[in-house]
């Protein structure tokens, strides 16, 4: 059989200009799931191709002619696109459609309206039986893998869209339980691969000629001693790439040996969740860090030549507009290389989603494609949805000023100063595009801008229900 894996993306992200901007942010890379699952099917004798819409065009007209099974990896923001493609496939061919991923794990019945079968959770142990028809249930529960060393390495030979950086997932899950995060719920419990197994995968990528690498772990430095050992082995065995990206936490700043090893092993770009400079907000999301940790982490990263991507969550219940501005000011003060402002997004299956639904605070008129951490999909406590949406763009524009590009160039090198200047340009293009969209009736931004009536109606309905109940 011919099996095609598709990682869909939203409409804007398929625009060449957006793809070019994403390339400035980081190297083209592909999520590991389809490459692992596809490799399992390939070794069983099937013809397999993997496509990532974010990284290139997909010729569906050609694929429809000879594909037996389409497999979609779905997150919340890409669900409408996945459903659209699934419906088109059913209309124009006899191919089967399978779906898996974070969103369909949380919303399986919704996905079954478009897919022939849905796999929830981890799919490695069931994918072959599902594809070959031995498992016929429409809803298939994946089986968590206890020993991650049993998971085969991603097979990049089946990837048909462009790639520059290899992705390594050395753990699954996260030992922390932030209330807005889907990972610790999709991939529980937290598990680690052995250091030997990780190093073996890195050797493969060196042989394949990759110059860039990403650790996909939600927190690569959660186990500091393990992270140190991986770095030592990378250095000793010549497995140092031009640049390796990773996710970290503020507490890595407390370990000088770890910071030195990260730098020497070229793990020189890190995303750290600052989230907020309001301690009450940090405590409310169970972040487990304090403001002093955040400052130390920023200073330590600059000292060791590690470029910090500061992630700030906008719209937490205890945060005011001033708190958000203070967080972005702080990111500038510690010379963060990039800012990732993320609008609080209530993803299905998370405590935040349950809270927002229970409190009747969701913007009902938006579909899943707006759940992209760039769009406001709920009623914040301390401002209107549109105020928060405007803050998202204002803070990005404020952080990415052209003048700071020169300083970044001095701190990290000319290449990164130029990239920072391009970030500033693209941010302004994005702000301008959002401004135009907010005036187009029916667009997501227009809906966010005009939601006051909705929440007034909701409040009136709630009051009416209370009156009826007490009568």
Describe these PLM feature segments.
Residues 1-212:
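Acidic, low-complexity intrinsically disordered segments
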Residues 152-309, 316, 329:
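Radical SAM [4Fe-4S] cluster-binding motif and immediate context
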Residues 8, 53, 102, 218, ...:
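Cofactor-binding loop segments of dinucleotide-utilizing enzymes, especially the Rossmann-like FAD-
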Residues 2-5, 12, 17, 42-47, ...:
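Radical SAM enzyme core and accessory elements
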Residues 108-113, 318-332:
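Catalytic cores of alpha/beta
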Residues 38-47, 208, 265, 297-308, ...:
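A structural motif corresponding to the C-terminal end of an alpha-helix
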Residues 98-99, 119, 140, 245, ...:
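Structural detector of well-ordered beta-strand residues that form the stable sheet scaffold
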């Amino acid at each position: 059989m011919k099996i095609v894996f598709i990682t869909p993306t939203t409409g804007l992200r398929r625009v060449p200009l957006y793809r070019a901007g994403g390339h400035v942010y980081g190297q083209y890379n592909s999520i590991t799931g389809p490459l692992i699952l596809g490799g399992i099917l390939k070794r069983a004798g099937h013809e397999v191709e993997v496509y990532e819409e974010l990284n290139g065009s997909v010729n569906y007209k050609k694929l429809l002619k000879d594909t037996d099974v389409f497999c979609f990896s779905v997150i919340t923001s890409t669900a409408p696109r996945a459903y659209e493609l699934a419906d088109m496939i059913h209309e124009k061919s006899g191919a089967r459609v399978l779906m898996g991923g974070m969103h369909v794990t949380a919303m399986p019945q919704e996905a079954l309206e478009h897919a022939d079968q849905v796999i929830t959770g981890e799919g490695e142990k069931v994918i072959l039986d599902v594809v070959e028809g031995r498992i016929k249930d429409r809803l298939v529960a994946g089986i968590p893998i206890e020993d991650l060393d049993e998971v085969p390495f991603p097979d990049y030979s089946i990837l048909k869209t462009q790639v520059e950086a290899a992705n390594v997932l050395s753990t699954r899950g996260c030992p922390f339980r932030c209330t807005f995060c889907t990972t610790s719920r999709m991939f529980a419990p937290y598990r680690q691969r052995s250091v030997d197994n990780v190093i073996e995968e890195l050797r493969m990528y060196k042989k394949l000629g990759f110059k860039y690498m990403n650790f996909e772990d939600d927190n690569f430095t959660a186990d500091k001693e393990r992270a140190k050992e991986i770095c030592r082995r990378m250095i000793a065995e010549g497995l140092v790439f031009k640049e390796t990206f990773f996710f970290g936490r503020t507490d890595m700043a407390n370990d000088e040996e770890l910071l030195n090893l990260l730098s020497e092993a070229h793990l020189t770009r890190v995303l750290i969740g600052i989230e907020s400079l309001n301690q009450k907000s940090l405590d409310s999301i169970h972040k487990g860090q304090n403001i002093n940790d955040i400052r130390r982490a920023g200073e330590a990263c600059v000292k060791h030549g590690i470029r910090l991507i500061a992630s700030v969550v906008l719209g937490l219940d205890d945060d005011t507009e001033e708190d958000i501005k203070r967080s972005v000011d702080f990111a500038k003060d510690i010379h963060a290389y990039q800012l990732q402002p993320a609008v609080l997004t209530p993803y299905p299956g998370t405590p935040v989603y349950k809270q927002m639904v229970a409190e009747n605070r969701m913007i009902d008129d938006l579909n899943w494609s707006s759940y992209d951490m760039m769009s406001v999909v709920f009623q914040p406590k301390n401002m209107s949805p549109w105020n928060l949406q405007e803050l998202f763009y204002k803070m990005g524009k404020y952080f990415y000023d052209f003048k700071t590009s020169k300083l970044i160039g001095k701190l990290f090198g000319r290449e990164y100063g130029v990239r920072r200047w391009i970030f500033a340009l693209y941010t302004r293009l994005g702000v301008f595009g959002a401004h135009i969209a907010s005036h187009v009736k029916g667009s997501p931004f227009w809906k966010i801008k005009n939601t006051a009536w909705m929440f007034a109606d909701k409040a009136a309905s709630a009051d009416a229900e209370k009156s009826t109940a007490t009568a």
